[in-house]
A protein has these predicted regions:
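Predominantly soluble domains enriched in secretory-pathway, periplasmic, or organellar proteins
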Residues: 1-257
């Protein structure tokens, strides 16, 4: 099925400016959506009840990644043009710290057990010397830099087996990082061009690849294995799991008819 447009929210900068990652802060007092508005170097804040623009968090050069952990009351951004990550207290949107990381930070993942933020960096020029910076959130410093085999994309932390998974565009793999040892532990061959969006649900990884395919990977039983492949109507981006409806949504910018 496809979603239907039901409304439009006007944001600063006009209709044709670029956006990137987004995440939600879900609390009973009023949930909010935070959207990386890359073209305006800001994160736009939207009221989820009224579908109204509230304000922007400014001075985030080239902001790309947005990640929220509601339980920890933390909002993270990757400020690509500044080669840093920013850490906010989400409830009042106050800036806690800014930490320098590798060149052109992009996707983010948060180890909730150790309070380590993983910043996946595209390198300079993009796609060369790619790294993951592991940031100690409470100490506001980089603990370790991990070399990556290619350009990173979306990433997730899996608390159940203490791994961080990140899509690598080329080679077409999902890289697993041991969150305790802070080192690469496994490479999962996706078997489709350009792993892009990545989700985790019910003990499975869902990898949306540029080759118009969704790979479903079981990663509990020994070596992770692809258990199913589903065709997509175009080149995908982010994936989102709706736990209540048990549905996985895959964003496709230009779907085929």
């Amino acid at each position: 099925m496809s979603l239907e447009e039901v409304g439009f929210i006007r944001l600063p900068g006009g209709e044709d400016t670029g956006f990137d990652h987004a995440d939600t802060y879900l609390v009973p007092s009023g949930s909010r959506l935070y959207v990386a508005h890359t073209a305006t170097d800001a994160v736009d804040v939207i009221d989820c009840r009224t579908n109204a623009y509230l304000r922007s968090l400014p001075d985030l050069p080239g902001v790309a990644g947005v990640l929220i952990d509601t339980a920890s009351d933390l909002l993270f951004t990757s400020d690509r043009a500044a080669a840093r990550v920013s850490i906010f207290r989400c409830s009042d949107e106050s800036l806690v710290a800014q930490v320098a990381v590798g060149s052109r930070p992009n996707g983010l993942a948060f180890d909730t057990q150790r309070r380590h933020l993983y910043s996946f960096n595209l390198g300079e020029p993009p796609g060369t010397n790619c790294t993951a910076s592991v940031v100690a959130v409470d100490d506001h410093r980089v603990l370790k830099t991990i070399a990556l085999p290619g350009r990173p994309r979306w990433a997730v932390f899996d608390r159940s087996n203490d791994r961080v998974y990140v899509n690598i565009q080329d080679p077409a793999i999902i890289l697993a990082i041991d969150a305790r040892e802070l080192k690469e532990s496994r490479r999962i061959n996706v078997g489709a061009k350009g792993p892009h969006g990545l989700g985790l649900a019910d003990g499975r990884l869902f990898c949306a690849a540029d080759g118009n395919e969704l790979a479903i990977i079981e990663r509990f039983a020994g070596d992770p294995q692809i258990v199913s492949r589903l065709p997509l109507r175009g080149s995908p981006d982010v994936v989102m799991h709706d736990e209540r409806r048990r549905c996985l949504f895959v964003a496709i910018g230009s779907p085929a008819s």
